[in-house]
């Protein structure tokens, strides 16, 4: 049952990410900003050919090699730790987010980012980035609370 749930979460995450990215590209000009919640959140369409804070900008080969490795490792750990909920949820979200951005990199050579926080200086991000970030936080919690690793 958990395998099916993991697959559903991954597919829903990827579909939501890709649909929203396509909507952004179709409705907002590159570099333009649409206010959603003044002084809190805007939509700003950018093409990101790097990672967070534009690190590794222009190094697509790095992500095209790294992402499949991360996916294989995450899938292996998901298989081994599926019974433990923190691992299960965290790794499932990491896989969904990694695949969402990987699809962009393969299809377009860059990742579409759009969420811009206005109350803090933070990199513009997308749904896949949210999935990855939440997944890594949950994975960290899983590692800290794992009785087998203590």
UniProtKB/Swiss-Prot annotation:
Pfam families: Peptidase_A8
Pathways involved: Protein modification; lipoprotein biosynthesis (signal peptide cleavage)
Active site: 113, 129
Originating gene: lspA
Entry's transmembrane regions: 5-25, 59-79, 83-103, 124-144
Taxonomic superkingdom: Bacteria
EC number: 3.4.23.36
Membrane topology: Multi-pass membrane protein
Localization per Swiss-Prot or TrEMBL: Cell membrane
Organism phylogeny: Bacteria, Bacillati, Bacillota, Bacilli, Lactobacillales
Coiled coil: none
Family: Belongs to the peptidase A8 family.
Any GO MF annotation of the entry: aspartic-type endopeptidase activity
Keywords: Aspartyl protease, Cell membrane, Hydrolase, Membrane, Protease, Transmembrane, Transmembrane helix
Role of this protein: This protein specifically catalyzes the removal of signal peptides from prolipoproteins.
GO cellular component: plasma membrane
One biological process term in Gene Ontology: proteolysis
Enzyme class: hydrolase
PROSITE patterns documented for this protein: SPASE_II (PS00855)
Protein name stated in the entry: Lipoprotein signal peptidase
Major subcellular site: membrane
Catalytic activity: Release of signal peptides from bacterial membrane prolipoproteins. Hydrolyzes -Xaa-Yaa-Zaa-|-(S,diacylglyceryl)Cys-, in which Xaa is hydrophobic (preferably Leu), and Yaa (Ala or Ser) and Zaa (Gly or Ala) have small, neutral side chains
Species in which this protein is naturally found: Lactococcus lactis subsp. lactis (strain IL1403)
């Amino acid at each position: 049952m958990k395998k099916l749930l993991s697959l559903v979460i991954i597919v829903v995450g990827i579909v939501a990410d890709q649909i929203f990215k396509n909507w952004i590209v179709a409705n907002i000009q590159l570099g333009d900003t649409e206010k959603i919640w003044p002084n809190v959140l805007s939509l700003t369409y950018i093409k990101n050919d790097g990672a967070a804070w534009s690190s590794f900008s222009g190094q697509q080969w790095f992500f095209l090699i790294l992402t499949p490795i991360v996916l294989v490792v995450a899938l292996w750990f998901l298989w081994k730790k599926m019974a433990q909920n923190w691992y299960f949820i965290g790794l499932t979200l990491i896989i969904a987010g990694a695949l969402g951005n990987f699809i962009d990199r393969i299809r377009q050579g860059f990742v579409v980012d759009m969420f811009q926080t206005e109350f803090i200086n933070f990199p513009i991000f997308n749904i896949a980035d949210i999935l990855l970030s939440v997944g890594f936080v949950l994975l960290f919690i899983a590692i800290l609370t794992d009785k087998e690793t203590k």
